[in-house]
């Protein structure tokens, strides 16, 4: 039931005194008082709609990337409310992690206090944007009432065999002094957070078996038709499913010693001239000969200092040393040397590859560098020619120099050789994945404690659920000197085993913060549940999320982990769906104007550039490059949202950021365009000011009653045109806000409608004008919610504009009495004529032939052919 809203006697503004701060603050208070943004209890048969932005890390400072993300989601949420849906639009905070811990170390403060302070600051900044967020559902991952359930879910995964601990070679960040998952190491071998070159270390770590879901994660991408193709491709490539064969090479002279390699090209087995192990392969130590021991040890030490990118870069030389062992090629009995090389990685496949230099580029480069044999076994198709000596032939073809398999095509040979090897026990078909199990251990303080106890007698023991949450100790030393800070807190570490009662100790690693963000969308549906993380029936009503909005940089981190979590929880019968997000919108970056000195790579503050038309470095005088790049402090190109809102208001900021570029494209910040949106809103104010209802029995009529049944039989031409423009706008904007969302073109349609109404409201009946303004204000409400509310009040609308129904097209208003018909002569456009909209082909032919255009251009000739495209053109061919 709608509560009373301010009457028309309440304050309203004209363009002459438009004060956006006063207006927006007033309406935000009113919305809060009315509780308009709370998630309603859905009525019977009412459709639910879940709109969600990727929740932010609470840095304490809102940036324009945040603004774009949250405003896009807010528009979608507001539209769906007006369409009659029960809408869930929550917000929370991804609040654990290294930045807060590092800030706490630098400032000697508690990271919890620091984080809560930042949350309060950012919430106040978000409130200024007029976002229709249900703050009653707010969650922060660092709060005990949230991470209790992260621990509960970890124990569910542990009980299902999906969480385990093992010794592993891990990615160590020497700056942040913690372990990183593979996904958190960039293509240059650097930490995604600190930028440090990542090192390799052996540590006992906790993992989640995401690889158990590799096939489901890649196969189900086909069902995500509401996701950008680019994101689906990135995930498929990261999972990296390859079909091939495992080949067993027996080590010569060593009983029961086998080197197993995975290859996608078993057809090239006859061309193998060596086998290569990763330097970290467990057999390197035992198979290295005494003569090669020093060289192998030195090489392994060298490789341990290199990043993955350095080891696998195509433009780098391929380095390696022989270890002094030989293996036997099972298909032909040849003896092949065993090497170690930088380009073979321990965590891909078996950590061993067969070198086939004639048909693999890396093997070719390696063989040329180390004078190893290059044997061609695949001939180019449909030719007697082999590949050029200067490169490997990696394509398909026909087998040669392959014994009984000569003449087979590549695909035939893959099957035949694998089948033959399987019959002899040295080969089997195999599917291999690039994806590795998710490493979740972190050796830092500010994270969710892993709810595990280690007992000398009982082994790994889960913390009983009734003892959750395992809370972080407070007031501890956060020196940042390596290792887990909580490992030094003996009073916290030492506990009794829940099973045997003997002395035991807690797990001192904390969880990767992506654990917390892999399920938060579920908690929003049931945020106050004190018995479970969520109720299955409730989440099944609201989820999957209908529209998820966030950056593409999360394609193979958060989005992949969230999909895994959803599938795992489904299999534990905790939820009834297998994918978390039905539709995904990945908004582009907000870029700022940047001045860069190309000679030295330095960035120059715009404040130091005296002439925009000829920008120069103030010190060197060098001409500067003018670029648009992602906003950052180091590039002096950031724009503070608070400054923009203080000057122009939230509605202007929203309109600019939505209009400037399609949501999935990068947006170039332009102060002049911000000013342009401010002027447009002022024009709307003047338009609304130009209309006034007549007095009726001392009362102002209401625009709500103007949802109006309009008799189209006796409308004037002006009225027909106004109704057509109004309903064309409904049609276009509704289309723009459905499916692939195009917010920029929706605002463009708003501008068209505004222009078509300007100066014409007094030329039509009040009912027609009121209908047009009612539609205009409702269409603009999701974009500029404060001004729309003000307009609705001024036009005597009942209740809030945001409680009104989305406008519906009147098809009769779109019917044209006449249309414009193009006249062509010999295919060239010669003019246009007006014809009845329902004219048949015969009528169109007569009208075209009798037109002045035809008389002029046919010059008395009769056309041999007449081509008619109804509703578009007539082509006369003499």
Swiss-Prot record:
Enzyme Commission number, as recorded: 6.1.1.4
Keyword set includes Protein biosynthesis: yes
Keyword field contains Transmembrane: no
Motif ('HIGH' region): 56-66
EC class name: ligase
This protein's UniProt keywords: Aminoacyl-tRNA synthetase, ATP-binding, Cytoplasm, Ligase, Nucleotide-binding, Protein biosynthesis
Annotated NCBIfam families: leuS_bact
Origin: domain of life: Bacteria
SUPFAM superfamilies: Anticodon-binding domain of a subclass of class I aminoacyl-tRNA synthetases, Nucleotidylyl transferase, ValRS/IleRS/LeuRS editing domain
Alphabetical list of CDD domains matching this protein: Anticodon_Ia_Leu_BEm, LeuRS_core
Binding of ATP, residues: 633
PANTHER family, A to Z: LEUCINE--TRNA LIGASE, MITOCHONDRIAL, LEUCYL-TRNA SYNTHETASE
Sequence motif 'KMSKS' region, location on chain: 630-634
Species of origin: Prochlorococcus marinus (strain MIT 9313)
A GO molecular-function annotation: leucine-tRNA ligase activity
Family under the similarity heading: Belongs to the class-I aminoacyl-tRNA synthetase family.
GO cellular component terms, A-Z: cytosol
Reaction catalysis annotation: tRNA(Leu) + L-leucine + ATP = L-leucyl-tRNA(Leu) + AMP + diphosphate
Gene name of the record: leuS
Annotated compartments: Cytoplasm
GO process terms (BP): leucyl-tRNA aminoacylation
Protein name, as recorded: Leucine--tRNA ligase
């Amino acid at each position: 039931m709608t509560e009373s809203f301010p009457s028309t006697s309440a304050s309203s503004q004209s363009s002459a005194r438009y004060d956006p701060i006063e207006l927006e603050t007033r309406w935000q208070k009113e919305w809060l008082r009315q509780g308009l943004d709370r998630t309603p209890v859905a009525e019977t048969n009412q459709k639910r709609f879940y709109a969600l932005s990727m929740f932010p890390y609470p840095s304490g400072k809102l940036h324009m990337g945040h603004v774009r993300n949250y405003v896009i989601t807010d528009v979608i949420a507001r539209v769906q409310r007006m369409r009659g849906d029960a809408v869930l639009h929550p917000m929370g905070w991804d609040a654990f992690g290294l930045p807060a811990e590092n800030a706490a170390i630098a400032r000697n403060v508690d990271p919890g206090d620091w984080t809560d302070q930042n949350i309060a600051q950012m919430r106040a900044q978000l409130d200024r944007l007029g976002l229709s967020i249900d703050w009653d559902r707010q969650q922060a991952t660092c709060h005990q009432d949230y991470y209790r359930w992260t621990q509960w879910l970890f124990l569910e995964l542990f009980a299902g065999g999906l969480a385990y601990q093992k010794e592993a070679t891990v990615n160590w960040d020497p700056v942040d002094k913690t372990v990183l998952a593979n996904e958190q190491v960039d293509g240059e071998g650097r930490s995604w957070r600190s930028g440090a070159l990542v090192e390799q270390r052996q540590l006992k770590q906790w993992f989640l078996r995401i690889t158990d879901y590799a096939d489901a994660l890649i196969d189900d991408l086909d069902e995500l038709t509401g996701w950008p193709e680019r994101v689906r491709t990135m995930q498929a490539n990261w999972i990296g499913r390859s079909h091939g064969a495992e080949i067993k090479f027996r080590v010569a002279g060593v009983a029961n010693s086998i080197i197993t390699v995975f290859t996608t090209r078993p057809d090239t087995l006859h061309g193998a001239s060596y086998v290569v192990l990763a330097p970290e392969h467990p057999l390197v130590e035992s198979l290295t000969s005494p003569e090669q021991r020093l060289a192998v040890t030195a090489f392994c030490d060298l490789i341990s200092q290199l990043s993955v990118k350095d080891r696998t870069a195509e433009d780098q030389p391929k380095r390696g040393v022989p270890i002094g062992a030989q293996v036997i090629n099972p298909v032909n009995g040849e003896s092949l040397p065993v090497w170690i090389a930088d380009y073979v990685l321990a965590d891909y496949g078996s950590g061993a590859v067969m070198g086939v230099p004639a048909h693999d580029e890396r093997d070719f480069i390696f063989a040329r560098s180390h004078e190893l044999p290059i044997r061609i076994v695949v001939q180019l198709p449909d030719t007697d020619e082999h590949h050029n000596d200067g490169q490997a032939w990696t394509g398909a073809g026909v087998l040669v120099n392959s014994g009984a398999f000569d003449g087979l095509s590549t695909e035939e040979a893959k099957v035949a050789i694998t089948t033959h090897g399987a019959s002899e026990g040295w080969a089997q078909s195999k599917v291999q994945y690039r994806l590795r199990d998710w490493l979740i251990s972190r050796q830092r303080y500010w994270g969710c404690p892993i709810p595990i106890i280690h007992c000398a007698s009982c082994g790994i023991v889960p913390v009983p659920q009734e003892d959750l949450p395992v809370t972080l100790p407070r007031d501890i030393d956060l020196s940042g000197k390596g290792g887990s800070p909580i490992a030094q807190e003996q009073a916290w570490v030492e506990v009794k085993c829940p099973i045997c009662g003997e002395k035991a100790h807690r797990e001192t690693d904390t969880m990767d913060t992506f654990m917390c963000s892999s399920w938060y969308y579920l908690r929003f549906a049931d945020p106050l549940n004190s018995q479970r993380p969520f109720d299955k029936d409730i989440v099944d009503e609201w989820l999957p999320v209908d529209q998820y909005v966030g950056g593409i940089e999360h394609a193979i981190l958060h989005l992949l982990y969230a999909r895994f979590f959803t599938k795992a929880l489904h299999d534990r019968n905790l939820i009834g769906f297998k994918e978390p997000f039905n539709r995904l919108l990945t908004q582009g970056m907000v870029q700022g104007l940047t001045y860069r000195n190309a000679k030295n790579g330095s960035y120059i503050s715009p404040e130091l550039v005296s002439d925009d038309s000829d920008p120069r470095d103030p010190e060197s005088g060098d001409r500067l490059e003018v670029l648009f790049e992602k906003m950052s402090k180091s590039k002096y190109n950031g724009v503070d949202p608070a400054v923009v809102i203080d000057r122009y208001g939230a509605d202007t900021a929203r309109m600019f950021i939505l209009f400037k570029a399609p949501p999935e494209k990068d947006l170039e910040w332009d102060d002049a365009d911000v000013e342009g949106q401010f002027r447009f809103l002022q024009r709307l104010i003047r338009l609304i000011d130009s209309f006034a209802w007549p007095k009726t029995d001392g009362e102002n009529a209401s625009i709500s009653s103007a949802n109006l049944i309009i008799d189209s039989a006796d409308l004037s031409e002006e009225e027909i045109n106004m109704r057509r423009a109004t309903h064309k706008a409904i049609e276009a904007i509704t289309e723009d806000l459905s499916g692939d969302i195009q917010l920029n073109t929706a605002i463009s349609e708003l501008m068209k409608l505004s222009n078509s109404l300007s100066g014409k409201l007094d030329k039509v009946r009040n009912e027609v004008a009121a209908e047009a303004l009612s539609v205009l204000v409702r269409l603009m409400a999701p974009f500029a919610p404060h001004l729309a509310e003000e307009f609705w009040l001024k036009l005597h609308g009942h209740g809030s504009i945001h409680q009104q129904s989305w406008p519906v097209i009147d098809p009769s208003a779109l019917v044209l009495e006449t249309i414009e018909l193009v006249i062509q002569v010999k295919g060239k456009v010669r003019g246009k004529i007006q014809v009845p909209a329902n004219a048949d082909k015969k009528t169109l032919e007569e009208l075209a032939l009798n037109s002045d255009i035809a008389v002029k251009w046919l010059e008395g000739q009769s056309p041999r052919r007449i081509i008619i495209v109804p509703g578009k053109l007539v082509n006369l061919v003499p």
